[in-house]
Each structure stands twice: as C-alpha cells, then as structure tokens.
C-alpha cells in the first residue's frame, strides 16, 4: 500500500528470504542525523518534515509543529519488595510496573512453592484478574490523570485484595467492581543487558501491532507506529489486544497512551536479574511469571522457557500456551469456575539475563 514501505521490505516485489541481507540506507542516514543532532535530528529538521509530509499525504492529522514540540519525560520508577527481592520497574504511562507490584504483593502472602499446580495457578490468575481490573480503571498518563499510585502499590491494599480471593473458587470478573474507589506481539522488542562492570539495562520499545501503521516515511527508513490503538477510543470497548479502557486512558491532545511495557530489574542479597518482553497486554504477566520462576530457584534459561498463562480481567478467561497446563490442572481450574482457553500458538518471548 505504501511506497516507502514497499521500497524497504519488498524491494524486488517479494519479502526478504531467510538468510538474505536487508539493507536500509535511509534508516542508517536517519540514525546518523540523530547521532549528530540529538532529538533535533529526528523531531525537527528534514526528518521531521519528511515524517509529517508522508503522514499528511495519507490523511493523518498530526502536524509538524506537534512533532517538533514532542519531549521525552523522565519519571521515577516503581520500586517495591517481594520475598527478599527488590524490584525496580516501569511507572505510568506504562501500566506494567503498577500491575506487577499489585500482583506480586498479593501473591507474597502465600507460599506458592508448597502448593499443587491447580491451586497455585488459581491464585496467580486471581491476582492477575484484580491487577488488570485496576489497570483498566485507574491508569493513564500522569500528566493528565490523577492516579492513586501510593494506594495501588501499597502492600496493605494488596492484602485487602488478597482477602477477596477464595482459595478454590474463581471470582467472576463482572462481579469485581468496575467503579473506582476513592482516590488517595505484537511488534514490541525488549533487551536485557548486564555488562562486566555491573551496569544494567532493561529496555522495551514498540510500534504496537505487526509493522505498526505499515507506513515507512520515504527517505527516512522510519516505520511509524499505530500506538493510537492503546488509547481507550471508547470507554468499555476493547482494543486490538482485547484490553478494556476507561476515561483515565481516553484520547486527549498531547497525551501519552497507556502501555503494557514492563522492563524490570530485580535484586536480592546475592543475585540480580533483568527481565522484559514483547507481547502486548501479555507482557506484564510474562514478567510476573518470570519473577516467580526466579523466586522458585530457576535459572535464566529455565525462566525464559516457562510456559505462559494469562488473564486480563476482561475477557474473563485464562489464556494458555499449548501444553502449558496439564489436563488434570485444566479440569480442576474449570471445576473452580475458570474458563480456560488453550491456544495453538506460543507467545512467550521473555528476554532475561
């Protein structure tokens, strides 16, 4: 559909084959301009003008002035404790850190390792359900939304949520209140790095869906995202990942959309691990399961290979990778009242070291 995209990915009319070298000289030049001129090399000048021109040609609504006025925000991370681990993770407008804090602090009240698999999975799913409910209701861009972050990440609040979980019965999602309490991949990439001096990086970047918007601005090599789908375009209507959205994540000029990115670093007295993943709304639960794996004594390879399960409040069902759950576990979970959907495809792509 888009000339610039065809020139990069369909140079001879066909997509590149495995083993073929994909050369992107326009993107290389754009990166050189950024290296030389910093932010001005991207948001302003010839690259910014080319981005705006290609978007305008296709009927897009943002202006060159809006792109030039974009600024990066640096925010304090979410930090909390879990069973001897100090966890550092992403703050809003990523929802990942708040949801991760809630889930781990709920689960920290139980000895999961001592439980049979169905009982352990049940509790993990119920923690996911409650965290994603709060994600939907409260979280958004902190420049626009007054969020009760101190409450949502408070161990006492997690204890209150834990008390609402029945040990052997699922909580129907539609019975969890959808009203706020009073205030107090698939085209995502993650890399986790530790160097010889102990410097650590956990970084996630995304264009949202496969190939983002599909538009490469001619002459730049830049593939533009379709992150607008991460906004709640209509309260109560799910996005492409099935995630519900409320007013806190509604579209507003200059607002950053809520994401699920969860780059995290965890440290104990003698260990450190870095985690993150692609996967849309499943990112948060992938990182959760990874941290639970490290806490259970697994190494990085074992953690990365863990089968994945996921629950996001709505739709009210457990998603599972093929063979992630034993048949007897599925049977018991269904007896507890859980809907279980075992898919045909894997989605786990946790990057950890």
Regions found by a protein language model. Give the residues of each.
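Extended C-terminal subregions enriched in glycine
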Residues: 255, 287, 295-345
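Short, well-structured alpha-helical segments that form the helix of a local strand-helix-strand
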Residues: 50-52, 116-129, 300-310
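Noncatalytic scaffold domains of N-terminal-nucleophile
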Residues: 1-38, 42-44, 49-91, 95, ...
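Active-site rim segments in enzyme catalytic domains, especially the processed small/beta chain
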Residues: 61-63, 199-268, 289, 296, ...
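Short, small/polar residue-rich loop motifs at catalytic or cofactor-binding pockets
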Residues: 74, 185-188, 210, 259-261
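Glycine-rich phosphate/pyrophosphate-binding beta-alpha loops
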Residues: 88-97, 192, 204-215, 277-284
């Amino acid at each position: 559909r888009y000339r610039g995209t065809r020139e990069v990915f369909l140079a001879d009319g066909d997509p590149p084959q495995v083993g073929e070298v994909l050369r992107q000289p326009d993107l290389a030049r754009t990166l050189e301009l950024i290296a030389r001129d910093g932010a001005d090399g991207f948001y302003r000048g010839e690259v910014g003008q080319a981005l705006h021109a290609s978007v305008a040609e296709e009927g897009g609504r943002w202006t060159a002035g809006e792109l030039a006025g974009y600024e990066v925000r640096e925010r304090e991370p979410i930090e909390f404790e879990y069973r001897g681990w100090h966890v550092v993770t992403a703050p809003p407008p990523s929802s990942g850190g708040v949801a991760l804090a809630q889930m781990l602090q709920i689960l920290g009240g139980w000895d999961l390792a001592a439980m049979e698999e169905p009982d352990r999975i049940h509790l993990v799913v119920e923690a996911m359900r409650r965290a994603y409910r709060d994600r939907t209701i409260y979280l958004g861009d902190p420049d626009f939304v007054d969020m009760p972050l101190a409450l949502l990440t408070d161990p006492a609040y997690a204890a209150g949520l834990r008390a609402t979980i029945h040990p052997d019965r699922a909580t129907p999602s539609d019975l969890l209140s959808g009203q706020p309490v009073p205030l107090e991949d698939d085209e995502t990439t993650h890399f986790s790095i530790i160097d010889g001096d102990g410097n650590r990086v956990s970084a996630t970047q995304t264009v949202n869906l496969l190939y983002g918007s599909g538009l490469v601005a001619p002459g730049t090599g830049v593939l533009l995202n379709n992150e607008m789908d991460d906004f709640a375009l209509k309260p109560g209507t799910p996005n492409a990942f099935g995630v519900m959205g409320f007013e806190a994540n509604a579209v507003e000029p200059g607002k950053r959309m809520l994401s699920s990115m969860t780059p995290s670093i965890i440290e104990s007295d003698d260990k450190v691990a870095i985690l993150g993943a692609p996967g849309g709304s499943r990112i948060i639960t992938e990182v959760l399961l990874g941290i639970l794996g490290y806490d259970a004594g697994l190494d990085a390879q074992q953690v990365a290979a863990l089968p994945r399960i996921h629950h996001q409040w709505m739709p009210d069902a457990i998603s599972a990778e093929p063979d992630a759950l034993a048949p007897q576990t599925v049977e018991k979970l269904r007896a507890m009242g859980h809907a279980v959907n075992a898919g045909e495809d894997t989605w786990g792509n946790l990057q950890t070291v």
